[in-house]
Amino acid sequence: MNFQNIFIFVALILAVFAGQSQAGWLKKIGKKIERVGQHTRDATIQGLGIAQQAANVAATARG
């Protein structure tokens, strides 16, 4: 009976440490995905600005 309690305690400690290491791995992937999203957002904003400038030039050229 005492061995069972010790086994459960050790298994619980291992589960806690394994959960923390998994969180670190998932956190790294999440940060990479977030960075890709930020770059996509910035590129879209920059592209819209260039498109607006081109539209203004075209409108000015037409008169």
From Swiss-Prot:
Entry function: Sarcotoxins, which are potent bactericidal proteins, are produced in response to injury. They are cytotoxic to both Gram-positive and Gram-negative bacteria.
Major subcellular site: secreted
Segments forming a coiled coil: none
Highest taxon of source: Eukaryota
GO BP: antibacterial humoral response; defense response to Gram-negative bacterium; defense response to Gram-positive bacterium; innate immune response
Lineage: Eukaryota, Metazoa, Ecdysozoa, Arthropoda, Hexapoda
Keyword Secreted recorded: yes
Cellular compartments annotated: Secreted
UniProt-listed PANTHER family: CECROPIN-A1-RELATED (PTHR38329:SF1)
Residue positions where Arginine amide is found in the record: 62
Family: Belongs to the cecropin family.
Gene Ontology CC annotations of this record: extracellular space
UniProt keyword list: Amidation, Antibiotic, Antimicrobial, Immunity, Innate immunity, Secreted, Signal
UniProt xrefs under InterPro entries: Cecropin (IPR000875), Cecropin_insect (IPR020400)
Name listed for the protein in its UniProt record: Sarcotoxin-1A
Signal peptide from the UniProt entry: 1-23
